[in-house]
């Protein structure tokens, strides 16, 4: 999926409002995913996945931090996510069908919390960006 110049502009603009809130946004997106799509929990055995757990918050910060890095390298997400894709494919062995599930929940959280900035065109651009991230993350699977 090709991100247009307008998409890149929209994603960078909304990400200015994400920066500094990576942990809260990430934790809520993960919590919603674990709640609404409970099969995703199987990759986190023995972890405390409750709403206020320190694990959920620290992991959420890492996930959205990685997205902040992808936004900073929006012209070359493949390279920016190369190691992360390897890790999910080779080490964590996460079924790539799960990536769009987290992408969906991140989109929901941004829509709720950044509503004034979440115009139709920003919605479309962020959806395309997260779909690209999910696609790139799945690219090392063979
Ligand atoms: C670890 C990002 C989707 C399962 C990680 C890490 C990052 C990350 C940054 C930490 C890597 C490290 O410490 O070296 C992302 C992004 C995703 C995504 C950006 C999609 C938008 C998923 C999904 C699952 C998953 C959908 C499973 C349902 C895991 C697991 C770990 C991990 C099990 C290891 C957790 C731990 O060490 O405690 N991910 N991830 N990821 N991810 Fe993902």
UniProtKB/Swiss-Prot annotation:
Keywords per UniProt: Heme, Iron, Metal-binding, Oxygen transport, Transport
GO MF annotation list: haptoglobin binding; heme binding; metal ion binding; organic acid binding; oxygen binding; oxygen carrier activity; peroxidase activity
Binding site for heme b: 88
List of residues binding O2: 59
Entry comment describing in which tissues the protein is expressed: Red blood cells.
Keyword Heme belongs to the record: yes
Pfam families: Globin (PF00042)
Keyword Iron in annotation: yes
Superkingdom, taxonomy of origin: Eukaryota
Cellular component per GO, a single term: haptoglobin-hemoglobin complex
Residue span, Globin domain: 2-142
Matches recorded under InterPro entries: Globin, Globin-like_sf, Globin/Proto, Hemoglobin_a-typ, Hemoglobin_oxygen_transport
GO terms (BP aspect): hydrogen peroxide catabolic process
Complex and partners: Major hemoglobin is a heterotetramer of two alpha-1 chains and two beta-1 chains.
Function statement: Involved in oxygen transport from the lung to the various peripheral tissues.
Family the entry assigns: Belongs to the globin family.
Protein known as: Hemoglobin subunit alpha-1
């Amino acid at each position: 999926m090709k991100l247009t110049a307008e998409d890149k502009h929209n994603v960078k603009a909304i990400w200015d409002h994400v920066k500094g809130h990576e942990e809260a946004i990430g934790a809520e997106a993960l919590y919603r995913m674990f709640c609404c799509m409970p099969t995703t929990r199987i990759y986190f055995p023995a972890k405390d996945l409750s709403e206020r757990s320190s694990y959920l918050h620290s992991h959420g910060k890492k996930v959205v931090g990685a997205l902040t890095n992808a936004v900073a390298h929006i012209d070359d997400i493949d390279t920016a996510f190369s190691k992360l894709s390897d890790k999910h494919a080779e080490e964590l062995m996460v079924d790539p069908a799960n990536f769009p599930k987290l992408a969906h929940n991140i989109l929901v959280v941004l829509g709720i919390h950044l509503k004034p900035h979440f115009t139709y065109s920003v919605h479309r651009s962020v959806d395309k960006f997260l779909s690209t991230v999910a696609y790139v993350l799945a690219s090392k699977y063979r």
